[in-house]
């Protein structure tokens, strides 16, 4: 193989090949490289200052991108120099990250594959252990995150995701303006959210937060009131309506066990129809519900009350929204619906947080979209024990999706 072709394989600015060896049996190409400048300057690994006062040197063997079917290894001279600021430090090589055994472009290629395929498939392609692939991917994502501009933090979203065994819940804190998560932590206690403020949100940045979208989980509210006393707590619309849907379902179960014979058979199998909004039903489903409501007034009232509650978030002025909700709550007194009376007491306790939406129009849908992205990432990766790695993966996926042109 001509030396000119071997030198062309490298393409590392400032470095050249001075020796090489090809092993046909293993399809391995080893290149010995060093700086090409007549009087090379070495940069301190700590402060980056250039210098020529060498302390010692050694050879480092690192893996580079393959050349066709050939595996390429680089043997590079690594120097230790005496820095006037940092003392004796290892030189900084621009295409190597610290003490890495892989070039930066090799790590970037592995990380790019990890965006489209699970770790097991990427590991098989590159002939690497799965844990090594995760480590390389995480290192690239960390460098990407460190180079991003810091987005303003004015609207926070706080929610939890149910995981199941082990760590049952994962608390997710999101920036609702950029639509991406900014912190994740195990469990859903007040201490969990306290740790977010201690680790990731210093006091000087807290004063810019105007509103927080959160569910009606009291430990979260306690932590937010303590750390962000000036911010408005806006209770998530979808969580409120989920409680209303649960009240409809509880009413359906009560009616099923209260009725007998044909009346019970009519209620059977109608759960998903009752949980769907009237606007999302086709003509046949609407006719089925009309027949059910004609024979069961309690289910008709429960369904109507749930749909009426959704109109609350269409009001712009707090006074009108408060009047609407007060009228809705008064209507519950004359209905024999225990589940909705329980819902009314819940809404009364959280009235101010629900009505704060009139002052801060937080995007409720982004909270659910972020949770959906995290669940999709968890399914594809079959779970993540490293929460920092999960956060970086979702941030990268969200940023990539935001840059793609609309179809």
Predicted regions, residues:
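Short, conserved DNA-binding cores of transcription-related domains
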Residues: 1-88
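Acidic/histidine-rich catalytic cores and adjacent linkers
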Residues: 37, 41, 46, 52-53, ...
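Short, positively charged, Gly/Tyr-enriched micro-motifs
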Residues: 48-167, 207, 222, 354-355
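Active-site beta-loop-alpha junctions of metal-dependent nucleic acid enzymes
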Residues: 99-101, 135, 182-205, 211
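A structural signal for short, well-ordered beta-strand segments and their strand-loop junctions
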Residues: 122, 157, 213, 233-235
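The DNA-recognition helices of helix-turn-helix-type DNA-binding domains
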Residues: 129, 140-144, 216, 251, ...
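Mobile-element integrase/transposase regions
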Residues: 148-181, 186-199
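Short, surface-exposed amphipathic charged segments that create phosphate/polyanion-binding patches used
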Residues: 245-256
